[in-house]
């Protein structure tokens, strides 16, 4: 493929042989029928020596961007590490929209980076579960780009369940995702909004913070 910058500072090697789609040329991620592992751990937690059952776990990126920026900076350094796990949920660099959100260009850049890294993982024989950003209607013309119908997909509800308005917005976006992608199943990491109604198979995992909070409560009861 053609590299457009000296020393490939834009990391175009990540999208070698990628099929680009949508108005903004987002790398397409193939659908997968993979069933998730027994649990999921975030990228930072995946390095813990306490983890012994790597092959039963999926790695997610539902944490602050700073905790996995190093993957973007030096992707080759972490490919062998990620191969130790059952599968990897596509990276999730922040996409913040709305009145106080990011400029659209930043959202699109992070959307691109998520897909570029996922494509590179696939090139390195790592099973990847597509990650879907559930966003408001004015983002629907780009937020589903690069994702295929009929796949297992994943999403996270961090910051989406605190208020009823946020929960309802998530549910509306989820329904549109179902309409467009017709997912085989959806992995939801985090609390499921009580307002969500769906016939799609849902597999729910807790975030690291949920687990820590529950362990704290249980510890206080001892």
Protein language model features and the residues they cover:
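Eukaryote-skewed repeat-based solenoidal scaffolds used as protein-protein interaction platforms
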Residues: 48-54, 58-59, 63, 71-217
């Amino acid at each position: 493929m053609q590299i457009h910058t000296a020393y490939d500072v834009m990391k175009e090697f990540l999208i070698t042989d990628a099929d680009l789609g949508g108005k903004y040329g987002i790398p397409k991620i193939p659908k997968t029928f993979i069933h998730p592992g027994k649990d999921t751990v975030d990228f930072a937690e995946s390095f813990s020596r306490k983890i012994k059952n790597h092959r039963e776990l999926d790695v997610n990126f539902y944490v602050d961007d700073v905790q996995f920026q190093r993957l973007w900076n030096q992707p080759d350094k972490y490919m062998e590490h990620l191969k130790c796990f059952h599968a990897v949920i596509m990276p999730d660099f922040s996409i913040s929209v709305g009145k106080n959100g990011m400029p659209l260009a930043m959202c699109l850049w992070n959307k691109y980076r998520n897909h570029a890294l996922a494509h590179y993982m696939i090139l390195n024989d790592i099973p990847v579960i597509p990650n879907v950003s559930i966003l408001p209607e004015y983002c629907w013309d780009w937020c589903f780009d690069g994702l295929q119908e009929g796949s297992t997909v994943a999403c996270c509800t961090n910051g989406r369940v605190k208020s009823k308005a946020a929960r309802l917005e998530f549910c509306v976006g989820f329904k549109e995702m179902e309409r467009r992608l017709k997912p085989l199943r959806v992995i939801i990491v985090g609390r499921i909004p009580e307002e969500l109604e769906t016939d799609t198979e849902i597999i729910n995992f807790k975030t690291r913070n949920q687990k820590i909070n529950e362990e704290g409560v249980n510890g206080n009861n001892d």
